[in-house]
Every structure is written in structure tokens, then in C-alpha cells.
Design a protein with these regions (language model features):
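Glycine/charge-rich, flexible interdomain linkers and switch-proximal surface loops
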Residues: 58-72, 121-133
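N-terminal intrinsically disordered, cationic/polar leader segments
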Residues: 5-15, 21, 36
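Short beta-strand segments
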Residues: 6, 32, 76, 132, ...
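Residue-level signal for inorganic ion chemistry
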Residues: 45, 75, 139
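Compact, glycine-rich, soluble single-domain proteins
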Residues: 19-69, 82-110, 115
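Short glycine-enriched loops at secondary-structure junctions
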Residues: 9, 72, 77-80
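Positively charged, low-complexity, intrinsically disordered RNA-binding extensions
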Residues: 92-148
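Extreme N-terminal starter segment of soluble prokaryotic enzymes
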Residues: 1-2
């Protein structure tokens, strides 16, 4: 499972011209489900998202987790599994089949909602989304459960 975490001041998802999700200060997490990913990957990623320390203290050092009023926007993005090895056209053969990927994405969403007293919102799986972000920093962190 691959994720990209971005610290944001605001984020929103629009599908077919309609606003479907919106957050203020917090994290936007793009999620790519890879063939062979399991519930173990879901819990590992949830732990990383819940505990990542990318919010700064007074000395501008990243030492704090998401603040109590922080929000999370979880966005499915199979293109994180795209490979350009030997080609200029992305190859998505490592992306999980849509049905299984949606199942694992929904489990991650559920786990984060249960573990957080904060607001957790999501994009729309399998839909074309317009994602607007106000990235803070910029701070962008990549994580792959397989260490790639």
C-alpha cells in the first residue's frame, strides 16, 4: 500500500461539479492499494497516519501529531501504483483489482474514523475527482508498506 500524506490548511473533493468532501487544517492522504495488500497493511498505514509528526513547534521543528482540531481527507488514488519502468506510458498492473481495493480503502476509512475523535472525510472511490488543496509548507511524505 502506498500513501502520500500532505499537510494542508484546506482540502476539498468535487465530483461531477458537486462538493463531496471538505476539510480545514489537517492531513490529506492519497491511498494506492497494491496487489497483495491485506488488512495488515491497512492497520500499518492507519498507525502511520495517526502518529505522523509533521506539525511544527515554536522552533519550526516537526514534533507534533495532528492537532485535536485537525481533520483528515482520505483520497483513493490507484495511479500511485503507476510505473514508468521502460516506458513513458504509466503501467498500472501493480494496482489491486477495484473491488478488493475498495474493500481495503473502506476498511482504512473505518479504522481511522474509529480511532480518531477527529473529522475523517473521503473522496469517491472509482470516480474522477477534482481535488483542491491548500498545501502547508509544503510538507509531503511518501510511505510504502513494502519499503519501495
Amino acid at each position: 500500500m502506498r500513501i502520500v500524506i500532505q499537510r494542508v490548511l484546506a482540502g476539498e473533493v468535487i465530483v461531477s461539479g458537486k462538493l463531496v468532501s471538505k476539510i480545514d487544517n489537517g492531513l490529506v492522504v492519497f491511498v494506492g492499494i497494491e496487489k497483495g495488500d491485506t488488512e495488515k497493511d491497512v492497520f500499518e498505514v492507519s498507525r502511520k497516519i495517526s502518529n505522523i509528526r509533521i506539525f511544527e513547534n515554536e522552533a519550526q521543528r516537526m514534533t507534533f501529531k495532528l492537532p485535536d482540531n485537525g481533520e483528515i481527507l482520505l483520497i483513493p488514488q490507484f495511479t500511485l501504483l503507476g510505473s514508468l519502468k521502460g516506458t513513458l506510458r504509466p503501467d498500472f498492473t501493480e494496482a489491486e483489482e477495484p473491488e478488493r481495493a475498495k474493500e481495503l480503502f473502506n476498511l482504512l476509512l473505518k479504522v481511522l474514523k474509529e480511532d480518531y475523535s477527529r473529522i475523517v472525510r473521503d473522496g469517491v472511490f472509482g470516480e474522477h475527482m477534482l481535488v483542491n488543496l491548500q498545501i502547508d509548507g509544503p510538507v509531503t511524505i511518501f510511505y510504502d508498506t513494502r519499503g519501495k
